[in-house]
UniProtKB/Swiss-Prot annotation:
Residues 136-152 have a biased composition (Low complexity). Residues 113-176 are annotated as: Disordered. This is Large ribosomal subunit protein uL22. This protein binds specifically to 23S rRNA; its binding is stimulated by other ribosomal proteins, e.g. L4, L17, and L20. It is important during the early stages of 50S assembly. It makes multiple contacts with different domains of the 23S rRNA in the assembled 50S subunit and ribosome. The globular domain of the protein is located near the polypeptide exit tunnel on the outside of the subunit, while an extended beta-hairpin is found that lines the wall of the exit tunnel in the center of the 70S ribosome. CDD domains: Ribosomal_L22. It comes from Mycobacterium marinum (strain ATCC BAA-535 / M). One of its GO terms (biological process) is translation. Part of the 50S ribosomal subunit. One of its GO terms (molecular function) is structural constituent of ribosome. GO terms for cellular component: cytosolic large ribosomal subunit. Belongs to the universal ribosomal protein uL22 family.
């Protein structure tokens, strides 16, 4: 699977890892889209056994980005990460009365693509100006909508309110 990205990237693969792909995906979902340093911190404290091989692959992809492509490790983000199914080793567990159960020892291929994306502080000033302009346009149109949205109360509600006030005034006046 080849993916083209607009940012410079690096890839790392771990093949035939003795972890079920389903269990690896559970760990992978924790780190997808995060920075490499955050992902490694999360995986360091994750209790799942699959977190160790996933962390190794992410660290390898970061090292590839730094050494092969000359990318800054601080700007690396885990852009794409997935676990495909590898070959399954079949074993036999003897059971009672001559039976045998099949055990499937599943393997997975873990692939990580890290991208060097600029942090929010390093974005171009032009794009931030454009965002501010859009925000001011939205703010300018918002009050105009509010003024047109105010409506008069419904006739039925207005007549009920008037009748209640007249009843209370009559009750007060009649008791004097």
């Amino acid at each position: 699977m080849t993916t083209t990205t607009e940012f410079p990237s690096a890839t790392a693969k771990a093949r035939f890892v003795r972890v079920s792909p389903r269990k690896a995906r559970r760990v992978i979902d924790l780190v997808r889209g995060r920075s490499v340093s955050d992902a490694l911190d999360i995986l360091r404290w994750a209790p799942q056994a699959a977190s160790e091989p996933v962390a190794k692959v992410i660290a390898s992809a970061a090292a590839n980005a730094q050494n092969n492509n000359g990318l800054d490790p601080a700007t690396l983000i885990v852009a794409t990460v997935y676990a495909d199914e590898g070959p399954t080793a079949k074993r036999i567990r003897p059971r009672a009365q001559g039976r045998a159960f099949r055990i499937r020892k599943r393997t997975s291929h873990i692939t990580v693509v890290v991208e060097s994306r600029p942090s929010k502080d390093q974005r171009s000033s032009k794009s931030s100006r454009a965002r501010r302009a859009e925000g001011s346009k939205a703010a300018a149109t918002a009050p105009a909508k509010k003024s047109s949205a105010s409506k008069a109360p419904a006739k039925k509600a207005a007549t009920k309110a008037e009748s209640k006030t007249s009843e209370t005034s009559e009750a007060k006046g009649g008791s004097d």
